[in-house]
Each structure stands twice: as C-alpha cells, then as structure tokens.
Amino acid sequence: MTPAGPAQLLIVALVVIVLFGSNKLPDVARSVGRSMRIFKSEIKEMNKDQIESSDQTLKN
C-alpha cells in the first residue's frame, strides 16, 4: 500500500470540511487531540502494569 498523495489528502480534507463544517473543525481537532493524549496515557499505564505484573510473577 502506497502512502497517500496530495490529491488523496485534498479529497479527505474536503470531505471533512463538508461533513463537519468549517466552524466546527477547530473543536473536532481539539477533541481528537485530547482523545489521542488519553489513549496514549492509557496504553502507557497498561504497559507499566503489565511489566509490574510480569516482575511480580518472576519474583514468585
């Protein structure tokens, strides 16, 4: 699968603008950013818990 070219990115951008409207785009982008930060922090916590759990298992 090849990376998206400029034409594909332009089409996606136009579809997003049509779906959400230009007034809501900043809010949508902000929400996506927050969601990504939360998701990343949860993944880090899961990995941390998994490492701690495996350390406990190895000690026993």
UniProtKB/Swiss-Prot annotation:
Instruction: Provide a GO CC annotation, any one.
Output: TAT protein transport complex
Keyword Transport on entry: yes
Q: Which InterPro entries match?
A: TatA/B/E, TatA/E
Q: Per UniProt, which keywords does this protein have?
A: Cell membrane, Membrane, Protein transport, Translocation, Transmembrane, Transmembrane helix, Transport
Q: Which residues form a coiled coil?
A: none
Q: Which GO terms describe its molecular function?
A: protein transmembrane transporter activity
Query: Which Pfam families has this protein been placed in?
Result: TatA_B_E (PF02416)
Q: Where are the transmembrane segments?
A: 1-21
Subunit and partners: The Tat system comprises two distinct complexes: a TatABC complex, containing multiple copies of TatA, TatB and TatC subunits, and a separate TatA complex, containing only TatA subunits. Substrates initially bind to the TatABC complex, which probably triggers association of the separate TatA complex to form the active translocon.
Please give the function described in this protein's UniProt entry.
Part of the twin-arginine translocation (Tat) system that transports large folded proteins containing a characteristic twin-arginine motif in their signal peptide across membranes. TatA could form the protein-conducting channel of the Tat system.
User: PANTHER family, per this entry?
Assistant: SEC-INDEPENDENT PROTEIN TRANSLOCASE PROTEIN TATA (PTHR42982:SF8)
What's this protein's name? Sec-independent protein translocase protein TatA
Q: Organism, per UniProt?
A: Corynebacterium glutamicum (strain R)
Gene name?
Answer: tatA
